[in-house]
Amino acid sequence: MKFLKKLLLKILGEKNYLFFTASIFQRLYRTGRLGKEYQDVYFLRSIIHKGNYVADIGAHLGYYTFELSQLTGVGGKVIAIEPVSKFSAVLEKIIDKKRLENIELKKVALGGKGDFVEIGIPIVGNQKKFGYARIKEMHEHLQYAETEKVPNVNGDELFKEIPRLDFIKCDVEGAEVPVFNSLLLTVDKHRPILLCELADKKERIKMFELLQPFQYKAYLLNDKKLHELDVFSDELAISHNHYFIPSARIQQMKHLF
């Protein structure tokens, strides 16, 4: 796989490689050929409905964005947040090509300190890991292939005019808790379903405690069903993807537990 990636990068160049990767993912998704590690993308069909307003924080190459666009429809809205210029360029190209008018792309970071932050693409195992892009100041120990300075905004300010918000997916490589620290007014107002990638027990406890004032419970997805998670348990989670669901939405989702 590493050899194939190197070969494709050499043949296509970085820009075309990223577009190719995004396109292949969508093709595999539509034909149902993605593995279990992508079960959460397929599960969107069970929790997202026409007319929903949703946010994809850390949109990357649109693995969630474009399915969310399809599911929310003409009356819905997808706020795709992607600060890394290499990735946002791919998203823009696909959005324009497919004329996806319900996607609003925001090229900003959330969860950092100050008006700007440095986002870096790290080197892991002698490879440039595009999917591991992260705020550099939170991970200074890593070696980075490249970095760029991007605008950093407050989440509540970004979403203050949105009329509703039904779902937030957040995958920002370790900055999930700081991101939601800047979104507490938004969460309180709209009580969206949350899907967050959390690396370990420490992070999931932080997220759980942050959301306690808003009556959220934690769940994991397994075999197309949501299973309540004891965030304080030492048991190894079956997935890094954690669902946080408020009591206000439990009744309408009871068939999924």
Show where each model-derived region lies.
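Phosphate/nucleotide-binding beta-alpha loop and adjacent structural elements of enzyme active sites
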Residues: M1-F257
